[in-house]
Amino acid sequence: MTNFTPREIVSELDRYIIGQKQAKRAVAVALRNRWRRQQVADELRDEIAPKNIIMIGPTGVGKTEIARRLARLAQAPFIKVEASKFTEVGYVGRDVESMVRDLLDLAIIMIREEEARKVRVKAEDLAEERLLDLLLPGAQSRDPDLSGEEAGEGGTRDKLRKLLRKGALDERKVELEVQAAQMPMMEVFTPQGTEEMGINFKEMFGNLFPKKTKRRQIKVSEAREILIEQEAERLVDMEKVNTLARERVEQSGIIFIDEIDKIAGQNGRQGPDVSREGVQRDILPIVEGSTVSTKYGPVKTDHILFVAAGAFHVAKPSDLIPELQGRFPIRVELTSLGEEEFFRILTEPKNALIRQYEALMETEGIRLHFTEEAIREIARIATQVNSQTENIGARRLHTIMEKLLEELSFEAPEHREQSVEIDVDYVRKQLSDIARDEDLSRYIL
């Protein structure tokens, strides 16, 4: 679990996301509280429940991006799900408990990689010995350098080890037994009907038959990596991995539920949306704290942090059932983005859009340079299009940039090794249709 301070978390988010200070502070405090809870005495730790967050704001203002960056910072099991993918129990679709199972699957991969790193040195030593066993038979007859004064097997093995460590044998080929690619099993049973029982039929039937292997001639450099992986797999205790993964999910897991407004009912509407409230009622016990059965054992959700987000264009947060509203005590409103924010988005972040397009064109030998006036004009046109049509926030910049560089991107391979300056006149010329046309529907994503 990360021990970044709230200020450090906000500072890290600032490198990628412009504005939305309130939302950044809320998730930073929530993440820090996860670490604080781990430092509390055992008898009180179980009593401290996470304060779930709901982020409210129009599309394209940074809700999902905050979640993505939070996942990388958290160093904890983190999964993003869309509420609209789930259906009430009894309907066709995924049941809500699958989000916890998916989180556990992710945690197992995370812990397994951590444990594999711990045994990497031992795995490398064992892999080296196996590689020497593969190289040694007939080595003297094939390589005159290995004969002579060190004709004994021990001497040959040591000499071979030195050559192997130097990389002198990397291009030599050895015969190695590797797992053969198998045809995927046909799904007779859909996972939706069986996952709540913790049964994976594909895995169950797959384990009934031995895995097929085949012998392949591969380079020593490639064989070394395969053998290290095989040895690490043998050294890692999967029982321990499963136990640690369950514990980490229970104590520091984070679930980000996007599009939560899509399951909000509107004044008791009936018809095709009748199952929306059912999905909310199914999500409720998981957010409140319950035990979910998985194939690795039961997982308690009492201390999993839930972060929900929605645009709430049509529905309102108050349209969610009261019990679910009460489980998200921290509400954060994200503000719409204007011209100044668009200018900053284009220039300030580490992965700024302008830098991305410059890097793409650089691969064709074309060096792009945007003047400040040109970037401000792009921001102004994006704001204008958003105000006259659907406001899709920062995503509008992708549309504008693609239109702006469409001609240049098409002709780039024929005009290598050039420097191109994008000035305000070029922007106005390329985007004149958008700036002039009142009916902008053909430019809407």
Curated annotation (Swiss-Prot):
GO annotation terms (biological process): protein unfolding; proteolysis involved in protein catabolic process
Annotated InterPro entries: AAA+_ATPase, ATP-dep_Clp_protease_ClpX, ATPase_AAA_core, Clp_ATPase_C, HslU, P-loop_NTPase
Keywords assigned by UniProt, alphabetized: ATP-binding, Chaperone, Cytoplasm, Nucleotide-binding, Stress response
Localization annotation: Cytoplasm
Binding site for ATP: I18, G60, V61, G62, K63, T64, E65, D258, E323, R395
A GO molecular-function annotation: ATP hydrolysis activity
Pfam hit, one: AAA
Gene Ontology CC: one annotated term: HslUV protease complex
Main location: cytoplasm
Complex formation: A double ring-shaped homohexamer of HslV is capped on each side by a ring-shaped HslU homohexamer. The assembly of the HslU/HslV complex is dependent on binding of ATP.
Record-linked NCBIfam families: hslU, PRK05201.1
Similarity comment text for this entry: Belongs to the ClpX chaperone family. HslU subfamily.
Listed PANTHER family: ATP-DEPENDENT CLP PROTEASE ATP-BINDING SUBUNIT CLPX-LIKE, MITOCHONDRIAL-RELATED, ATP-DEPENDENT PROTEASE ATPASE SUBUNIT HSLU
Task performed by this protein: ATPase subunit of a proteasome-like degradation complex; this subunit has chaperone activity. The binding of ATP and its subsequent hydrolysis by HslU are essential for unfolding of protein substrates subsequently hydrolyzed by HslV. HslU recognizes the N-terminal part of its protein substrates and unfolds these before they are guided to HslV for hydrolysis.
HAMAP family according to UniProt: HslU
Protein name: ATP-dependent protease ATPase subunit HslU
Originating gene: hslU
